[in-house]
A protein has these predicted regions:
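Non-transmembrane, membrane-proximal soluble domains of secreted or membrane proteins
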Residues: 23-62, 85-303
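Hydrophobic alpha-helical transmembrane segments
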Residues: 65-79
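Residue-level signal for alpha-helical transmembrane segments in multi-pass membrane proteins
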Residues: 14-17, 77-80, 113-116, 120
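N-terminal secretory/membrane targeting signals
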Residues: 1-24
Length: 303
């Protein structure tokens, strides 16, 4: 227990100056609407702000219609069989063993349905996997249990911890000190477990390429509002891309079980105007230039 307290205090001492400096940089971004986050009693996707997210929502709605029609059809058939062919209504059961036309139909029709679905789903999949040339390239490294980011074209690197994690002086619980940190960073109390002490900052309407890897175990970098999710596998470098169409703050979380603090590994992305991004980047280069702390200590291979 004493060792854990010592490690937590050491992490706080090392991380605090960086966290406050990063907050000062982000304070120049102005007020941003908090768009991409879970909603109480929400039953659908988060509001999508990328073409990828819109495509996924459209595909999901189309599949819902198809599945609903199939389910209703099957339930009607079951109801007919129950009513017309129960023991009381049909005292003399049929003796035939097969019906060739029906068997052909229930084989061919599902094949046609799957081909129809594939004709629309495969283009969505390919669009996600075909990585365009990025206006901004950011390397993401998953650690137990925080994220490291490196703007590879500018040698700017920083680490991102959940507000309330031991590295920020917390113990993964919401208390008065954590409430104060959330308020100082511009977050609300219900954004605890989502907000981080440092955020990824990207320009609006620009192609962002994220190069994702892991330093210890498998993690997964996910932003629902962007329609992106990529596993962070140690020893491999995978890519995803997005182009956010609306300024705001967007939240995500690690989506691959990675240990006891998996639930405390959120992601915060701030989408800002190009002018605000350039100003933030210039300040970040001055503050962190030449210090890409998120570089893992091993070679990675493209997959």
């Amino acid at each position: 227990m004493a060792l854990k307290k010592l490690l937590a205090a050491t992490a706080l001492t090392l991380a605090a100056p960086f966290a406050y400096a990063q907050s000062a940089l982000e304070s120049g971004l102005g007020e941003l609407e908090h768009i991409g986050k879970p909603e109480q009693a929400g039953l659908s996707f988060q509001a999508g702000v990328t073409e990828l997210a819109s495509d996924i929502r459209w595909l999901d709605n189309m599949l819902l219609v198809i599945i609903t029609v199939i389910s209703v059809f099957v339930m009607i058939l079951l109801a007919i069989c129950i009513v017309r062919y129960n023991a009381r209504a049909n005292k003399t059961p049929a003796t035939f063993t097969h019906n060739t036309p029906i068997e052909i139909a229930w084989t061919v029709v599902p094949i046609l349905i799957l081909v129809f679905i594939g004709a629309f789903s495969l283009p969505v999949l390919f669009k996600q996997q075909e990585i365009p040339e990025g206006d901004v390239t950011i390397k993401v490294t998953g650690y137990q249990w925080y994220w490291g980011y490196e703007y590879v074209d500018h040698e700017v690197g920083f680490e991102s911890y959940m507000i309330g994690a031991p590295a920020t002086g917390g113990d993964y619980r919401l208390n008065d000190d954590v409430r104060a940190q959330l308020a100082d960073a511009g977050y609300t109390e219900d954004e605890f477990l989502l907000a981080t002490d440092t955020a990824v900052v990207v320009p609006v309407n620009k192609t962002i390429v994220m190069q994702v890897t892991g330093a210890d175990v498998i993690h997964s970098w996910t932003i629902p509002a962007f329609g992106v999710k990529q596993d962070a596998v140690p020893g491999r470098l995978a890519e995803l891309w997005f182009e956010a169409e609306e300024e705001g703050v967007y939240f995500g979380q690690c989506s691959e079980l990675c240990g006891f603090a998996h639930a405390y590994m959120p992601i915060t992305v701030k989408v800002v105007s190009e002018e605000a991004y350039e100003a933030w980047l210039a300040a970040a280069v001055d503050e962190y230039g030449g210090n890409p702390e998120s570089l893992p200590a091993f070679e990675t291979a493209m997959n």
